[in-house]
């Protein structure tokens, strides 16, 4: 293994007898993406390539004289003859086609963001990937990225917002917005909530499924890469829309208004040492709103966007607003044994969701390229859940309810540039998540007894929490022909604090906040990589190695108040190899790589979070360690026509010390306690199939399917 690693590490330094031709495809005002380029030698042998999503191309040829022809819709063909004797840089400059009718000049604009361009990106990519364009998404009812990701091969969406790729939970997947790694939006899991990004603000989504050295190392299932809108023309759009749901529209809806935590309420210690009389006075500071019932209206959404270009400067502003109602009927059961029920519940979950956001992109397209992109999003979810049924474990009839409110603010801002063979990115992320007054009201009576329902006061629950996270990142990359090197740094700082109460009577609260219900955390990650990429005829090779150094610190406490500092220090070497063979319309791929999964702040903090919907508490584990993952991919792709493809994939993954959520020892279904652990090993393998066919200009046929199997051994149990 060590010998193989050093071969991979120094492979980029090997030289070959052929020469490399690289360059860009541009017009006078903008980059031209995915342009076709044909090289014909003296023997009339043809070699083809295409520029990528950065308007760059590279090809390996034998020395000689070549006729070059490059074309793209909306531009005159670029034709030139050159003599190639050594490594050569060829910058292709297109001239726009114009058709003059009297005094009107019509310019044909080059298409971007199309399904054909995404298929071409996937085809030309060095790694195994799948994707969607905004052209395709517009033909669906999808209004946010969470909805759209359901249509990507091998991707499943949980709770309408969390992504599972190839059967791996959200904690094994990562997300990038433009070029910035997105943080977790959740206090109780490592996950990004994709429903907060509207599809109206994006150009495309690419999901990488195999790794290369220039990608982050902390993922295994999929790396979701979201590209926000860019503009090349002046435009103004205003849209209004409405949606009707047979289950949720014009139905009786229930919501309990949220309440802010009183600003003059005493600290945990001061409240606990107060007498009962003072506690009753303090309790009166809390609003105690009752549920309100109203008739839901149709979902409403609106959008405003405009773009402005002048010379080499482009600007884009876009904003959307959406108000929606969701109603879910849920059956929830758990068993004490294979045949004996622990409980049998019927839930009705009402969700009222409001979101608004804004996107501002400023771009300069000269000899060098610079852009500043900022996305601001605010979303609030108000939920009310009613639960009825039987709890056989506690011998009770249940008629309970809970209300929850979640406010999310996400700010993503980044500045990036490309200067000749250098490119860089500076980014900032801010996540704010507030949970004001999560309430649980357990109402029960004895099972099978004719008696009134009563509130179980000691099991009531009122919860307030605030989480904020700031992250800063920077990356720089440099190309030396077919060799690319780079490095980056990421800093994350998080704070979390919660206050928890229960009722002792109708007019007095008991604070049950623990020392574990707050933590601070910071995370430092430095990375360096070296990558080699080249083509020889029908073969393409991408190989390299990435090194990541990570410092990880979580400051919390145990139940006694004793400080608990969780410190981790990791140095990881992550090699990768991607090989493809392209024959006419068919492409074969092979990929092998090492990646990893680091514990999230929440997973190692001692904080215990009660989830009434799942009927469970979730507790962190301060002894949790990172997981090493070895990945293997084989893929066959066929491209019959532009924008069409058929593909079949085989994949396998071997996890060393996987991070798994388990039921804690001694836990029972009626009082479920979940935590995290590192089993010795796990494996995952499966197959994927995708079919994409364009029937007419307005009608596409698209289908995909995945079958997978996973095995994990926890304490001797598979």
List the model feature ranges, each with a label.
Residues 42-56:
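Short, acidic Ser/Thr/Gly-rich low-complexity loop/linker segments typical of extracellular
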Residues 180-181, 432-438, 446, 450, ...:
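Surface-exposed extracellular loop regions of Gram-negative outer-membrane beta-barrel proteins
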Residues 471-478, 509-527, 619-621, 625, ...:
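Outer membrane beta-barrel strand-and-loop segments of large Gram-negative receptors
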Residues 40-45, 69-80:
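A short, solvent-exposed loop/turn motif at the edges and junctions
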Residues 26, 36-40, 71-73, 89-135, ...:
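Short, acidic, small-residue-rich periplasmic hinge/interaction motif at the N-terminus
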Residues 459-461, 465, 481-584, 609-611, ...:
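Signature of Gram-negative outer-membrane beta-barrel scaffolds
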Residues 111, 120-164, 179-197, 201-213, ...:
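Periplasmic N-terminal accessory/gating domains of Gram-negative outer-membrane beta-barrel systems
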């Amino acid at each position: 293994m060590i010998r193989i690693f050093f071969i991979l590490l120094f492979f980029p330094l090997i030289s070959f007898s052929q020469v490399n031709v690289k360059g860009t495809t541009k017009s006078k005002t903008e980059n031209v993406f995915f342009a076709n380029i044909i090289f014909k030698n003296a023997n009339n042998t043809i070699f083809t390539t295409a520029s990528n999503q950065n308007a760059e191309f590279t090809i390996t040829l034998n020395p000689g004289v070549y006729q070059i022809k490059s074309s793209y819709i909306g531009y005159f063909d670029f034709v030139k003859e050159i003599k190639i004797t050594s490594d050569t840089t060829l910058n292709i400059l297109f001239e726009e086609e114009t058709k003059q009718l009297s005094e009107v000049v019509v310019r044909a604009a080059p298409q971007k963001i199309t399904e054909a361009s995404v298929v071409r990106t996937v085809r030309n990519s060095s790694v195994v990937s799948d994707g969607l364009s905004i052209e395709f998404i517009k033909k669906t009812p999808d209004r946010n990225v969470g909805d759209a990701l359901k249509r990507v091969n091998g991707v499943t969406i949980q709770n309408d917002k969390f992504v599972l790729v190839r059967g791996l939970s959200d904690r094994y997947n990562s997300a990038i917005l433009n070029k910035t790694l997105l943080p977790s939006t959740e206090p109780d899991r490592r996950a990004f909530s994709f429903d907060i990004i509207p599809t109206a603000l994006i150009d495309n989504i690419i999901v990488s499924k195999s790794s290369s050295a220039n990608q982050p190392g902390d993922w295994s299932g999929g790396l979701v890469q979201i590209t926000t809108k860019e503009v090349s023309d002046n435009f103004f759009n205003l849209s209004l829309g409405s949606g009707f749901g047979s289950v949720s529209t014009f139905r009786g809806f229930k919501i309990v208004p949220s309440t802010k935590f009183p600003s003059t309420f005493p600290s945990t210690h001061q409240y606990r040492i107060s007498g009962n009389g003072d506690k009753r006075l303090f309790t009166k500071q809390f609003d105690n709103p009752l549920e309100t019932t109203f008739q839901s209206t149709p979902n409403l959404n609106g959008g405003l966007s405009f773009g402005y270009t002048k010379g080499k400067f482009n600007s884009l502003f876009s904003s959307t607003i959406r108000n929606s109602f969701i109603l879910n009927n849920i059956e929830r059961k758990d068993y004490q044994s294979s045949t004996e029920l622990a409980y049998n519940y019927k839930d009705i979950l009402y969700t009222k969701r409001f979101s608004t956001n804004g996107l501002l992109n400023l771009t300069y397209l000269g000899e060098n390229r610079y852009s500043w992109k900022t996305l601001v999003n605010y979303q609030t979810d108000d939920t009310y859940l009613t639960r009825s049924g039987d709890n056989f474990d506690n011998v009770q009839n249940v008629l309970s309810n809970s209300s929850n409110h979640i406010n999310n603010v996400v700010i993503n801002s980044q500045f990036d540039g490309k200067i000749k063979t250098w490119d860089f990115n500076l980014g900032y992320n801010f996540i704010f998540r507030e949970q004001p007054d999560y309430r649980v009201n357990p109402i029960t009576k004895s099972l099978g007894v004719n008696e009134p329902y009563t509130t179980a006061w000691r099991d009531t629950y009122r919860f307030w929490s605030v989480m904020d996270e700031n992250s800063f990142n920077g990356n720089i990359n440099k190309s030396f022909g077919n060799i690319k090197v780079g490095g980056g740094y990421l800093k994350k700082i998080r704070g979390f604090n919660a206050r928890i109460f229960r009722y002792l009577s109708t007019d007095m609260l008991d604070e049950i906040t623990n020392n574990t219900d707050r933590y601070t955390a910071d995370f430092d990650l430095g990375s360096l990589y070296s990558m080699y990429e080249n083509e020889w005829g029908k073969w393409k090779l991408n190989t390299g190695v990435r090194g990541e150094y990570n410092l990880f610190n979580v400051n919390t406490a145990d139940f006694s108040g004793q400080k608990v500092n969780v410190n981790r220090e990791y140095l990881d070497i992550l090699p990768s190899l991607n090989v493809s063979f392209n024959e006419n319309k068919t492409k074969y791929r092979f990929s092998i790589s090492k990646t990893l999964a680091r514990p999230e702040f929440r997973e190692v903090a001692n904080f215990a979070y009660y989830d009434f919907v799942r009927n469970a508490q979730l507790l962190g584990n301060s002894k949790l360690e990172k997981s090493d993952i070895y990945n293997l991919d084989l893929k066959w792709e066929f491209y019959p026509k532009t924008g069409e493809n058929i593909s079949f994939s085989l994949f396998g993954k071997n996890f060393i010390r996987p991070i798994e959520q388990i039921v804690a020892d001694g836990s029972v279904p009626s009082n479920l306690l979940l935590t995290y652990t590192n089993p010795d090993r796990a494996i995952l393998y499966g197959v994927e199939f995708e079919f994409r066919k364009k029937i007419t200009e307005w009608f596409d046929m698209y289908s995909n399917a995945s079958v997978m199997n996973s095995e994990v051994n926890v304490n001797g149990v598979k």
